[in-house]
């Protein structure tokens, strides 16, 4: 059935279902404009936080409690922001009007009270979209910290295994 032929109840039920999914999926979705201002997000529902008042705006780094954004007073103002791979990928996507996938970065985020630094590994993808004639990007932010930690441990174990194998070979050769 084409959408325009569905009843308002069916459309509302589908909208409610989609909203519920987005509010409970294990990733942050952020709709941002070319100034890195967050226009919409599921961040608040995932963290069980009250949504900001209507009219209040936040940039991506401010919303995620980026340590550099907090130190500089605003997202994008810290000297380290120029070196941020995620910021560069977003800027390039807006400039080229295209999407990007799986940009990985290690970040230092602050807790809600901004008194504790939390190291975090993220994977960010961005889908370029035009809404009402305005350029936007839908960012998908995955916390991959646990995955990266397991990867680091596996690399250490692999190096230890190689070292043990060399010692074993040397020992056998000297017998």
What are these regions (language model features)?
Residues 1-17, 48, 69-72, 80, ...:
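N-terminal membrane-sensor/transducer module of prokaryotic signaling receptors
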Residues 2-8, 127-163, 168:
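Sensory coupling linkers of modular signal transduction proteins
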Residues 45-59:
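PAS/PAS-like sensory domain cap-loop motif
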Residues 77-124, 135:
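Per-ARNT-Sim (PAS) sensory domains and their PAS-associated C-terminal
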């Amino acid at each position: 059935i084409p959408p325009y032929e569905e009843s308002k109840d069916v459309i509302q039920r589908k909208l409610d279902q989609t909203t519920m999914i987005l509010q409970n999926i294990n990733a942050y979705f952020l709709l941002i404009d070319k100034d890195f201002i967050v226009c919409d997000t599921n961040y608040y529902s995932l963290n069980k936080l009250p949504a900001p008042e209507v009219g209040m705006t936040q940039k991506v780094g401010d919303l995620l409690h980026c340590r550099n954004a907090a130190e500089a007073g605003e997202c994008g103002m810290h000297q380290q922001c120029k070196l941020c791979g995620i910021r560069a990928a977003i800027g390039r996507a807006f400039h080229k009007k295209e999407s990007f996938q799986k940009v990985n970065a290690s970040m230092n985020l602050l807790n809600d009270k901004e008194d504790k630094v939390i190291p975090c590994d993220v994977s960010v993808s961005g889908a370029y979209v035009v809404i009402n004639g305005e350029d936007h990007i839908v960012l998908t932010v995955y916390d991959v910290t646990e995955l990266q930690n397991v990867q680091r441990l596996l690399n250490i174990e692999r190096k230890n295994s190689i070292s043990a194998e060399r010692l074993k070979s040397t020992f056998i050769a000297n017998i």
